[in-house]
Amino acid sequence: MKINILTLFPRYFEVFCRESIIGKAIKQKKITINVVNFRDFSKNKHKKVDDYVYGGGPGLLLQIQPVVDALEKVGGLKIALSPQGQKFDQSVARKLAKEDEITILCGHYEGFDQRIIDNFIDFELSLGDFILTGGEIAAMAIIDAIIRLKPDIINPESLKNETFNDFLLDFPQYSRPANFRGLEVPKVLISGNHREIGEWRQEQRELITKKKRPDLWEKFLKIKNKK
């Protein structure tokens, strides 16, 4: 899979592309990440890529020319990060993980010239209902969520029980020591009875989801009732 990242701040991604799962996937040539600087496509001698908004108002806007020129040099599904976009979730991550190539545009300032969105983008994505200075942090989160779903990146058994796979949150997990300052690990987990451990974990997933995320609980019940 190839992921193109269009940004004003390519250095944001230097450590991101070297460390953890992303770095490992790149070294193993499972994925390619191509970071593109909008400024490289500016026709301004000072590499300026922003300007004032027509009609007045505070802030600056990314200009259409350098953004479109950058877009035309890359392929795949074109995705702009925007507060107006579809909310990113695990189901979107799964769909994007099936693509051979995607391009992510990181906004900045007051966003993009609307003509970019209307004519050169396939769709918009939002990480949630909050404001970030730019799209770089959101891009990293989205890329991480996508890459870990690709084959041979993470143990498939580890993915099966992860939160959101079946609309249930994960079960509580514990490690050594079994007793820390009187705080004990549930006895069932050290019983060696794998059937009881499995039942306990499923029960905990349902209890936690029902309590903490009633919206996910409703989705889980709908799927469960259809079976």
Curated annotation (Swiss-Prot):
At the top of the EC hierarchy, this enzyme's class is transferase
Q: Which residues bind S-adenosyl-L-methionine?
A: 107, 127-132
Give the E.C. number(s).
2.1.1.228
What UniProt keywords are attached to this protein's entry? Answer: Cytoplasm, Methyltransferase, S-adenosyl-L-methionine, Transferase, tRNA processing
Known InterPro entries for this protein? Alpha/beta_knot_MTases, tRNA_m1G_MeTrfase_C_sf, tRNA_m1G_MeTrfase_TrmD, tRNA_m1G_MTases_N, tRNA_MeTrfase_TRMD/TRM10
Under SUPFAM superfamilies, the record lists: alpha/beta knot
NCBIfam families per record: PRK00026.1, trmD
Q: Which HAMAP family match?
A: TrmD
Q: What does this protein do?
A: Specifically methylates guanosine-37 in various tRNAs.
Q: Which family does it belong to?
A: Belongs to the RNA methyltransferase TrmD family.
- What biological process terms from GO does the record include? tRNA N1-guanine methylation
Q: What protein name applies here?
A: tRNA (guanine-N(1)-)-methyltransferase
Q: Where in the cell is it found?
A: Cytoplasm
